[in-house]
């Protein structure tokens, strides 16, 4: 029995001696360093690893590694206990070219990275504390790990350059600006992160050149912005409050909820466009005035729904966009104000309501407009009619009117009906082509039994106006002839006048 115990004791001493010689002697350190170097250098060709210093003993660690002769990683620390793996280290990282790690992280990286701090370990639990100048920022961080699993993260980034961050991640530089980010995240028992992360972008500016290159969409104006986002992470949900202030528009999104698993999104929003003329290059329509919209956004794996309401042209507008279909309703607006917003001639004053359905993909839809108590405004068109007919159309009040239109890819086919107590204006199959900017319509006008027609042709902005007064002249002559016939006693003259009347 004593021999057996002695053999075991000698064996343990031998194993410990081998272990000590392998890990804590100069020969052992040299062997391990060469093994690590060869392992890294043989498995990849992106960079070469070489240790300038590799010292490990029972109390201290001192490592200096060169990466491609231009970058260095230094680790210097004290081993307090081998049995519970308790140690404290100071590290310094200076990477001149992050692209050497592209294959390892499966992501294109650019730029440089400098970081330094402390690493404390015990029983597989580690805390990494440090600072960095990533993207020319002032960054502080604290990461707690259980072996290699992140348990908590405390990150504070101040004044990082947006363009440098995007370049570091090898993303197109869509924007310039200063990024601030503060995150405090803790992993829960369900292996999800909970906590708050706040970020803002100050002095943001869109990079027009990159936007044109990436999206083939030229932007002429300078777009500046500031963005602030307050976020809470609860398991798989992100709860956010976002405020965007820009030279184009302001946007508030409160109670934004994003499910990171299903990608579902829900939020309310408030959109404030201060000057509609500034968005002309994005919508290809010159508009006047401003626009404020309040609504909701809901998206799931099957559908996208956006609704909103606004006060437009003195009326109330409501819309619902469900996937590709847009339903728009406008009630009790003023037509003059609406024409001003649409940057069109203010030729008709009335109370106006409309109901429209439009598919934004097929570009097919319909629009029905109802007007009440309307009258034409004196303009060149009305004056030309008056010159031909001696009738002032602007004095007529049309109590009711309807315009029913079909939309087919910027082509509109319409029927018009305006009625007053004694008059009416009708048009059938009127045609407007916004692509070619042309109009082709005929208005049949009956003003207190004075009948004539007006054709509008060619250029939509300055159409050719053709007034057909044949029916009007006929009606006037018939009235005159009837007057003479009723006064005439001579039968032969009466027959002559009737013969003349029959010519019309």
Map each language-model feature to its residues.
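Outer-membrane beta-barrel and related beta-rich outer-membrane complex signature
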Residues: 209-211, 377-384
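Amphipathic hydrophobic-ligand
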Residues: 46-48, 66-76, 103-118, 133-142, ...
């Amino acid at each position: 029995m004593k021999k057996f115990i002695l053999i075991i004791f000698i064996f343990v001493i031998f194993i410990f001696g081998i272990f000590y010689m392998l890990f804590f002697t100069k020969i052992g350190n040299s062997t391990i360093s060469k093994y690590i170097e060869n392992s890294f250098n043989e498995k990849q060709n992106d960079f070469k690893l070489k240790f300038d210093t590799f010292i490990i003993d029972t109390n201290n660690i001192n490592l200096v590694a060169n990466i491609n002769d231009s970058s260095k990683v230094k680790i210097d620390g004290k081993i307090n206990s081998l049995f519970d793996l308790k140690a404290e280290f100071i590290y310094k990282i200076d990477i001149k070219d992050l692209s050497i790690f592209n294959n390892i992280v499966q992501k294109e990286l650019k730029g440089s990275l400098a970081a330094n701090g402390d690493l404390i370990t015990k029983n597989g639990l580690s805390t990494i504390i440090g600072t960095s100048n990533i993207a020319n920022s002032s960054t502080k961080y604290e990461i707690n790990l259980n072996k290699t699993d992140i348990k908590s993260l405390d990150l504070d980034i101040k004044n990082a350059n947006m363009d440098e961050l995007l370049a570091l991640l090898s993303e197109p530089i869509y924007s310039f600006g200063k990024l601030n980010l503060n995150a405090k995240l803790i992993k829960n028992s369900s292996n999800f992160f909970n906590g708050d992360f706040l970020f803002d972008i100050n002095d943001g500016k869109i990079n027009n050149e990159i936007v044109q290159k990436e999206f083939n969409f030229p932007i002429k104006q300078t777009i500046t912005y500031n963005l602030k986002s307050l976020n809470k992470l609860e398991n798989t949900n992100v709860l956010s409050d976002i405020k965007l202030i820009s030279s184009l528009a302001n946007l508030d999104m409160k109670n934004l909820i994003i499910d990171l698993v299903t990608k579902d999104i829900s939020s309310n929003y408030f959109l404030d466009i201060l000057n509609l003329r500034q968005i002309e290059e994005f919508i290809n329509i010159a508009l006047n005035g401003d626009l404020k919209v309040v609504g909701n956004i809901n998206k799931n794996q099957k559908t996208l729904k956006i609704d909103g309401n606004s006060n437009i042209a003195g009326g109330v507008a409501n819309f619902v966009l469900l996937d590709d279909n847009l339903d728009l309703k406008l009630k009790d607006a003023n037509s003059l104000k609406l024409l001003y917003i649409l940057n069109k001639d203010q030729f008709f004053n009335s109370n106006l309501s409309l109901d429209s359905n439009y598919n934004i993909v097929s570009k097919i839809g319909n629009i029905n407009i109802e007007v009440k108590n309307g009258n034409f405004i004196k303009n060149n068109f009305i004056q030309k009619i008056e010159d031909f007919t001696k009738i002032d159309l602007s004095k007529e009040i049309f109590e009711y009117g309807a315009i029913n239109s079909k939309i087919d890819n910027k082509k509109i086919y319409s029927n018009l009906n305006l009625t007053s107590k004694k008059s009416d204006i009708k048009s059938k199959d009127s045609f407007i082509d916004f692509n070619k900017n042309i109009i082709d319509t005929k208005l049949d006008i009956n003003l207190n039994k004075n009948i004539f027609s007006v054709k509008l042709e060619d250029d939509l902005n300055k159409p050719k106006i053709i007034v057909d007064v044949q029916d009007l002249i006929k009606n006037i002559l018939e009235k005159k002839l009837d007057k003479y016939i009723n006064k005439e006693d001579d039968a032969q003259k009466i027959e002559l006048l009737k013969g003349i009347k029959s010519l019309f």
